[in-house]
Amino acid sequence: MRIRIALTAACVLLLAACGPKWQETEADGFKLVNQKGGATLGYTSAPLLTVDRYAFKDLNRNGALDPYEDWRLPADTRAKDLAAQLSIEEIAGLMLYSGHQAVRGPEITDPQKKFLKEDNLRAVLVTTVESPETAARWNNNVQAFVEALGHGIPANNSSDPRNETAATAEFNLGSGGKISLWPTTLGLAATFDPAIVEQFGQIASEEYRALGIATALSPQIDLATEPRWSRFNGTFGEDPDLDTDMARAYVDGFQTTPDAKDGWGLKSVNAMVKHWPSGGPEEAGRDAHFNYGKFAVYPGGAFETHLKAFTEGAFKLNGGTKRATAVMPYYTISYGIDPSGDNVGNNFSKYIITDLLREKFGYDGVVCTDWGVTNDNRAIEAFDGKCWGVEGLSVAERHYEVIKAGVDQLGGNNDKGPVLKAYQMYVRDFGEAAARARFEASAVRLLLNSFRTGLFENPYVEPAASAATVGKPEFMQAGYEAQLKSVVMVKNHGKALPEIPGQAGNDGKKKVFVPERYFPQTPGMFGLSMGAPGHWDYPVDKALVEKYYDWAVEPEEADFALVIIEEPKAGSGYDVNDRKKGGNGYVPISLQYRPYKAEYARKESIAGGDPKEDFMNRSYLGKTVTTYNEKDLDLVMLTKKQMGSKPVVVVVRATRPVVLSELEPYADAVLIAFGVQNQAVMDLVSGAVEPSGLLPMQLPADMRTVEEQKEDVPHDMRPLVDADGNTWDFAYGLNWSGVINDARTAKYRK
């Protein structure tokens, strides 16, 4: 009997030793395979193979384990194997990057099915999502759809930055939200703390993966040396050293999975750094989303300075992933930089992409164009194609030029047709073997980013886990703390702040007067449309204010006033009406509140020329512009008059350097807020938190110094000096004790 029992036990052990090392469970909408010492697999329709007792997905359904299906092999081995198996039609699909896709429900739309199936597209740009759970279910439906196609290549979903807050959002300790809320990139720079930026990357990447997103179209590390540029807000400011450190921290945070081999794991998100070689030095601040802003200029000869955040930051990480996996060139023509004299948009420039990025700096990651560079441009002011310097070519020819320049992927293009035409042009000029090798090289780079992030093993996400992860309380708190650290106090005359509220229900509780602000009708993003009609309203919710102070209806009742305004807003540098009246259409971009006449502008622009213009000079010398929100200055002046000797605290919501010399004499305290909740402002004003932010850029004394600075040179303006003798320069900020001097200022202040 004992012998029989022993034999039975031995058989059980033998079967266990010889049986599979994995087990399968049903997840919400997909199957999950967990295995001891092996990769976790998620799938819906692909057959499973068992090799050496481990499970593998037979993605191409050929009944054999291909190297690209073998999760035990290095990512580059797998990518090369799969790329070699793909047809040119399939590779053409990998080279596409979708237009913006809003996720309003879990189902895949018919246009999405078309570009996924017929065009073989696998890189999808996700914009708004209805909820984390909806995003998860949509992702799972997309992944199930593409798993059943061809080689089973998963979708690599991506996102532009999605963690910026609204002023009216409220933070409640212990409560969650739809996603963690952080200051703008410029606000993160104002913390002067790369550790905060890395923490943001770690948290945001975890939220992204919970939404089914594996690529971030960020960070924007353009060196913002031109103060009038509308995209200044998305950068880390104007200092090369700070920009470099923040770029490195951001990418490390996004790409690194803690304790994972080589840094890559299921919490990793590919970072697509932008914009090479910098969109910062736009002539006169006009943005290259439009024809009128297509030139980046270098009057100070500082081209190399703009590369540092890439070459010394994003390409030299502290973490195991080593470098950012993708780069996006900007729309601009880097005027006069190519030694050959060829002035074309960066995405079309062999010098910018191959000679510099790939050969000089050794970058072999993905290069993806900015969105819409191969499309036609209909008018100087039109928001459509951005084919700068190659306007005379066809759409297919532009695709060919981009590929010859060294680019791998075409942003905003859903149609493989022009890519296939470009392939035939390559065959015509260089032969079939060279064309195949060139396209296959791009396929390898593109596939690597999906293999490294584990998408081939499990691209699915649990909807319930997504809802629990995105915006969970500890993430919300970290974002809110970063907001508090991003606000910069630039003036505190007579220690007007903090305004300690006192205790509720006690006679010592202070009263605050918050004047209504006029919200003017202003153009939307990139000037595409006008916003809501102009109206008067309070800039902060009364209920929020009353958590700190009593609400004063009239200024004479108040102990102090709190005025919350926007920076001066004055257009994009081009006016169709000026052109209709016989001008060239080019006008100043003002950073001051009062009407501005450009008396110190260049007589001759540095760059110019377009097939749709019969002149070269884009100067606006002598022209005058007004701001949409001049009433903000009037409001500050009126409030100061009403308050008499009582303190007036002004909060300026800023996105770039602004001229505040008109406002400064009428404010006792000034706070600069870079995309933070009003609650953060109230916590600072009330003294609940001490301000610690520093200016990530200079605040200019006047528009003359703005006109006379060189677009490509950092720190070359004359900063404002206030009534207390403080200079509002880079790395300046106040706390309750006065001017901040600490380890951050010692490291970065010039």
Question: What residue spans do the PLM features occupy?
Answer:
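Glycoside hydrolase catalytic-domain context in secreted enzymes
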Residues: 18-750
